[in-house]
């Protein structure tokens, strides 16, 4: 069982994050909810690494992307999703991204296995609770480019 971060599972090499800047990140009106707790499937391959589940911004609300086992691209690093406030209080969001050895963004590898969220509830921006089912279909599935 896992939530975002703090995992003892094999993880990809982490990219050093640059400071978030307007124009390079997405402006969002409010922070994401707390991470969902997920049941992590058995590691499907000895070379696989675990990418924790994460929130992504849909333009209107936060959507959960389930954690997943992937084979990392050769010499690639992974920059975790993050939020930051500008000096004037604007909240910025940058999704998790993969980068090649030159730092260029590359497509996320297809998942070998995906985590399953436990049943629970998230609170929407205006305070309304929304139920989450344990086997809810992921809001976003990584796509090959």
Predicted regions and their residues:
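Low-complexity segments
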Residues: 10-140
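Short, solvent-exposed mixed-charge patches
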Residues: 143-145
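Sec-dependent bacterial lipoprotein signal peptides
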Residues: 1-3
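Bacterial signal peptide processing site
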Residues: 5-8
